[in-house]
Design a protein with these regions (language model features):
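Short S/T/G/P-rich N-terminal loop/turn motif that feeds into the first structured element of a domain
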Residues: 1-76, 81-99
Length: 99
């Protein structure tokens, strides 16, 4: 099992807008690509951090899913909404495997 975690940082004063944006993106990924995404906000540590968590059977499934997503023009259109509400350059992707 592979768990993908994408963490981003909301712009100052935009945390609630950023959380709504990430939830919209998660809803789209489920409806269009069948990917279950959990959205979490950090409650300790740096303020304004938001993450999306999704699970895949293996790395090949992860790569197949994200290649399809990155080829989706509607996905790119939705991500443009992040401008002004997410801090650019503060996105961090990690992949985890079951022990």
């Amino acid at each position: 099992m592979i768990t993908a975690v994408r963490t981003g940082q909301s712009a100052p004063g935009k945390h609630s807008h950023a959380a709504e944006f990430v939830k919209e993106l998660a809803t789209y990924l489920k409806s269009k690509h069948g990917i279950d995404v959990t959205v979490k906000t950090q409650i300790g540590g740096p303020v304004g951090r938001i993450c999306m968590i999704s699970n895949y059977e293996n790395l090949a499934e992860y790569e197949k899913a994200w290649n399809k997503i990155h080829a989706d023009p509607e996905f790119h259109k939705i991500t443009q909404k992040a401008s002004g509400i997410m801090n650019p350059g503060h996105t961090h992707d990690t992949l985890w495997r079951s022990a």
